[in-house]
């Protein structure tokens, strides 16, 4: 029976369920735990070797000395693997009842029926439900949970796995590489264009839980795909860790849009590595919504490797009481005539802290490259703070770089104008915030835009967490 979490008001994601897992590893990170995960999944020897090497790297690498405070993150107090069911089901009726009730509340079956080409639902460490329209399979599209792709498409999987984000990239990429479980694997063949999105939903249910999904997307030459992920967790008094890795390969003339709407509870550390390689005339779009969490550190990255490659990041971050949103983007121009755009919208309230942290790099071969950066922050009270930390590296003098940053508060004139028309101060402030984030929400499919606006309203009311 679902339990109501404390102090979540109308926040529909704040509930948690009784433990329904069929296997749960001991807390703490050891070689035995890593071997146990690999053994439970019946993985090939090369993957176990990869995991063990990654674990050694994790032990050797220092914690980041920049960004948010990670001093309270205790790796020995985390459960690294929870298996909720025997297998990923293709029929919703076959999903275990407790888990099904959770996703029913979150609207996953309804969403699939209405407007999705395929959907995947991950609960704790494993995907429990996965389905895709039959005609997409007939076109050669692969959309599977990552564990199944390793077993069923090993040659393709091995070719691309860890090619964009190696284990040595950073400490949390090494951690993910050692204990990864679940995530999505997508391959879209040459010249195949998906008109409707694929979606994955990630849910942490347990206390002191670590979720470490690994997502790998390959858009072959001339292909296009839109992938949407949603993330939530219940409210607990102790911390959980979400540390995902996302790798995307955008081949010549291909197009990928990756949309994230995360709404973690305020006890979750969200430490994610997302990167894409974009080849000739390819186009990569990150649309990134960051709400909730205790601390988010996330900087979607485009490495523009082919002439004419394009990359863009459109992000929103909302930090409330006790929250730090340290987010931004990285654009690495390695080829001529590449272009990138970063638009960052940040809101802080009730003492929350938002940080834009970005890197734009122009390599020696990036002749004719151009980048445009726009950072806007809206601070809603005197206790909240905002920082903008851009870092630009230029090794070619034939490039164009524009950067605009703006920090503002809700003006008395705006409030007076709206209130003089019979609107309350609370409603007026909400309207101003909604107008501020409109460039983000207009890029979402309608159903997601409605949900995003609702989540922002909850944040404005202080009812999340």
Curated annotation (Swiss-Prot):
GO biological process, alphabetically ordered: iron-sulfur cluster assembly
InterPro entries: Fe-S_cluster_assembly_SufBD, SUF_FeS_clus_asmbl_SufB, SUF_FeS_clus_asmbl_SufBD_core, SUF_FeS_clus_asmbl_SufBD_sf, SufBD_N
Pfam family membership, one: SufBD_N
NCBIfam families: sufB
Family: Belongs to the iron-sulfur cluster assembly SufBD family.
Protein name: Iron-sulfur cluster assembly SufBD family protein SAR0880
